[in-house]
């Protein structure tokens, strides 16, 4: 669905205003994963696009569905209409669900729509203030994020912790996953209201993130846990900055990565030793070739040496690669060098030519390719 074209066709907004709403809509999925709130962007329809009296659709709504980000024409609720009239953030209740609604203003200061956050009915009254802080911070991120920054945002899971703190380092919000993670790390005090520095988190880069307003990611080790810490600063105004701190337990991923590195090192060592053994065999055959006085024996031994060295070459190349894949061109170039050294006399002028694209193949296939090139 072309969201921008739909906005242009059904609302009085111009291209620049449409581009702004379309830009904000790119963060709906990310925003919902952080807030666990339903996020909708709305703007008034053209009068000719409004539904009949029975449906009375008067707003174009941009939201997430199973098909992705879509637009649909809806009847705006009282909170939405009030926002369009006075342009101030509002808290409303629609269908027994709490909504936090914030204005979207274009460069000319005109209110062109709003962002609505619908809070889950399971949220308790004592959590309302924190939920509003969460909505307020998220809507500022949606309004201020650049295209480059949006590309770096990835939805978080239910198991990821989320903390919001301000430029005075006071924690304003912490979701349940964050409380559990920080508790595991040994922080036994109330999270919200305390200083981010009083926690057990390793957050030495906080001031730099707040001052420079740049995204920062690090992996920190806490005893037997590895936590990826992703900080996203948000400019709430000229003199206020808040920061999302996403905590992701990547202990399992880190262990798997370490295991892969160990396995890769072992594989490279095996290839290196196989190469040495093959070269030893080739050396023994070369000694036998020197001792023999029969030309046909020398030729047979030399052919065997070439085959063995072609296989040793593959293992040598793999032992220097981080992956168990080799470029055919690399095999060809090295094999031609060996063949030139062992078979081409100084008075001969032999040219080797490679034509075609280079291809990556597994070390298993590379052994066959090297033998084929050797025979050719």
Model-based region annotation:
Residues 20-39, 139-171:
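Sensory modules in modular signal-transduction proteins
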Residues 28-93, 171-192:
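Structured interaction and signal-relay segments at domain junctions
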Residues 89-108, 112-117, 195-252:
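PAS-family sensory/regulatory modules and their coupling/dimerization elements
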Residues 113-151, 236-273:
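Sensory coupling linkers of modular signal transduction proteins
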Residues 254-267, 271, 326, 343-375:
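Conserved short strand/loop->alpha-helix "switch" segment adjacent to the catalytic nucleotide/phosphoryl-transfer site
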Residues 265-279, 283, 287:
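Conserved phosphoacceptor histidine of two-component systems
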């Amino acid at each position: 669905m072309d969201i921008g074209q739909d906005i242009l066709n059904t609302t009085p907004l111009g291209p620049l205003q449409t581009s702004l709403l379309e830009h904000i809509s790119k963060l709906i999925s990310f925003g919902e994963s952080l807030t666990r709130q339903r996020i909708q962007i709305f703007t008034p329809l053209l009068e000719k696009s409004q539904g009949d009296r029975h449906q009375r659709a008067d707003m174009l709504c941009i939201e997430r569905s199973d098909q992705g980000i879509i637009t649909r024409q809806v009847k705006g609720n009282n909170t939405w209409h009030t926002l369009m009239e006075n342009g101030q953030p509002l808290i409303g209740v629609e269908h027994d669900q709490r909504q936090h609604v914030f204005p979207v203003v274009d460069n000319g200061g005109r209110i062109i729509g709003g962002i609505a956050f619908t809070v889950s009915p399971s949220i308790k009254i004592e959590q309302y203030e924190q939920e509003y802080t969460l909505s307020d911070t998220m809507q500022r991120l949606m309004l201020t994020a650049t295209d480059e920054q949006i590309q770096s945002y990835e939805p978080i899971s239910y198991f990821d912790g989320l903390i919001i703190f301000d430029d005075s380092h006071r924690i304003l919000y912490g979701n349940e996953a964050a409380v559990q993670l920080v508790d595991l790390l040994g922080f036994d005090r109330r999270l919200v209201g305390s200083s981010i520095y009083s926690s057990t988190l390793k957050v030495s880069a906080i001031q730099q993130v707040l001052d420079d307003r740049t995204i920062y990611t690090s992996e920190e080790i806490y005893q037997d846990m590895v936590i990826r810490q992703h900080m996203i600063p948000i400019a709430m105004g000229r003199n206020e900055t808040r920061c999302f701190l996403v905590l992701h337990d990547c202990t399992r991923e880190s262990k798997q990565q370490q295991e892969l590195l160990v396995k890769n090192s072992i594989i490279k060592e095996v290839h290196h030793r196989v190469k040495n053994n093959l070269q030893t065999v080739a050396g023994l055959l070369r000694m036998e070739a020197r001792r023999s006085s029969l030309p046909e024996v020398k030729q047979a031994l030399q052919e065997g040496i070439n085959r063995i060295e072609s296989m040793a070459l593959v293992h040598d190349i793999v032992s220097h690669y981080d992956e168990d894949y080799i470029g055919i061109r690399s095999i060809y170039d090295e094999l031609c060098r060996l063949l030139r050294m062992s078979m081409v006399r100084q008075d001969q002028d032999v040219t080797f030519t490679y034509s075609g694209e280079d291809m990556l193949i597994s070390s298993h296939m590379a052994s066959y390719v090297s033998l084929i090139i050797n025979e050719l």
